[in-house]
């Protein structure tokens, strides 16, 4: 079918009609690649409650809604995924993964769409990608024990270390309490105070400098529906928090999002102990997949028994915004070719930090 038949309309998330909302939910339900809570309409609604720039590019073909591209649109035409730095996974809500996104954006106010975690199965993102990488996941469809056995066969040494820490904690004589659905607001506050301290300590970008991001976490914590739930899980040792995790889940997928641990309990590997308990509990509560996200991180590679490809890059049309972004990318590429060692990466890191700030503040 000719992609030229597609027409587009940019609509605030809050302005979607009842028919459009039904189409969103229907297409997501029919597409297994959209099972992540990130693709739930309710997640878009929560973002829209906190950000005035939350929009959806509605794609229509022959009078039928063909898809939605949720985005945050800046005043100078740069579109980014909903949630900005919090948007680990994003993409088209559609039942047709071959839609021509370039053609769709040409008729919109968005001159550039920056993406960093879009399904590579959606050909519009794959064609425009500068990088495609695996997003790691834990497949629990055969149960938690089957996953652990799979990991033992893949890396026996890693699993021996995990079991040794489990025994060390179990035999410590300490009072151990797991709360897999911790509804205490004070535990949530302590979790994110620790997370933000971790960001400061490691010089990582703290997205929670933006009030909307802090408010979104509170909203998710209170939001409890089958399609979208904020989930706080904690491990306490002798009545003190030792590890915590805040994520969100849909009917079948948990997105592993903000894990933290308290350094004084590091010898017990509390974060990993908590994740194992979460996997066992949630496998019996409808969760068949835990999304760990992309990244060359040791624990993700060791624990994941599945993955799917995600794409990063830009879809753009000629514009001032596109030219500025292309110039920045060119400067980064030039610097990386110079014999400067680690210094050669500084321009790219600075540009990435600026882009993250822009996404956080809607610039």
Task: Describe the role of every protein-language-model region.
Residues 2-7, 122-153, 251, 284-347, ...:
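Active-site/acyl-donor-binding loops of N-acyltransferases
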Residues 8-62, 66-79, 118-123, 127-135, ...:
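A conserved beta-strand-loop-helix scaffold within acyl/acetyltransferase catalytic domains
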Residues 62-63, 96-97, 139-143, 238, ...:
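Short loop segments at secondary-structure junctions
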Residues 106-123:
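ATP-hydrolysis module of ASCE/P-loop NTPase motor domains
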Residues 89-94, 147-150, 179-181:
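Acyl-group handling in specialized metabolite and lipid biosynthesis
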Residues 84-109:
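A gly/proline- and charged-residue-enriched helix-loop-helix capping module
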Residues 86, 107-109, 129-132, 172, ...:
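A short, structural micro-pattern
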Residues 77, 99-107, 207-325:
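Aromatic (often tryptophan-rich) hydrophobic motifs at membrane interfaces
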């Amino acid at each position: 079918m000719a992609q030229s038949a597609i027409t587009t309309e940019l609509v605030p998330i809050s302005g979607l009609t009842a028919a459009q909302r039904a189409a969103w939910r229907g297409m997501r339900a029919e597409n297994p690649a959209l099972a992540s809570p990130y693709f739930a309409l309710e997640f878009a609604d929560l973002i829209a409650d906190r950000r005035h720039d939350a929009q959806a590019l509605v794609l229509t073909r022959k009078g039928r809604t063909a898809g939605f591209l949720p985005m945050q649109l800046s005043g100078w035409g740069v579109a980014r995924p909903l949630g900005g730095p919090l948007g680990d996974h994003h993409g088209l809500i559609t039942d047709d993964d071959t839609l021509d996104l370039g053609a769709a954006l040409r008729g919109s106010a968005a001159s550039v769409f920056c993406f960093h975690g879009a399904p590579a199965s959606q050909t519009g993102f794959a064609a425009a990608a500068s990088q495609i990488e695996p997003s790691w996941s834990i497949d629990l469809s055969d149960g938690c024990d089957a996953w652990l056995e799979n990991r033992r066969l893949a890396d026996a040494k890693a699993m021996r270390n995990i079991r040794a820490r489990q025994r060390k904690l179990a035999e410590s004589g300490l009072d151990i309490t797991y709360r897999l659905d911790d509804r205490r607001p004070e535990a949530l506050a302590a979790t994110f105070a620790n997370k933000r301290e971790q960001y400061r300590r490691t010089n990582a970008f703290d997205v929670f400098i933006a009030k909307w991001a802090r408010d979104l976490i509170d909203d998710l914590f209170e939001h409890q529906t089958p399609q979208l739930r904020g989930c706080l899980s904690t491990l306490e040792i002798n009545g003190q928090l030792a590890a915590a995790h805040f994520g969100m889940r849909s009917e079948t997928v948990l997105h592993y999002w903000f894990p933290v641990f308290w350094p004084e309990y590091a010898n017990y590997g509390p974060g990993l102990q908590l994740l194992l308990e979460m996997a066992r509990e949630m496998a019996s509560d409808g969760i068949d997949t835990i999304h760990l996200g992309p990244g060359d991180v040791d624990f993700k590679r060791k624990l994941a028994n599945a993955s799917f490809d995600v794409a990063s890059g830009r879809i753009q049309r000629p514009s001032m915004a596109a030219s500025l972004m292309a110039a920045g990318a060119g400067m980064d590429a030039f610097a990386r070719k110079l014999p400067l060692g680690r210094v050669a990466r500084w321009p790219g890191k600075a540009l990435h930090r600026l882009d993250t700030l822009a996404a956080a503040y809607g610039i």
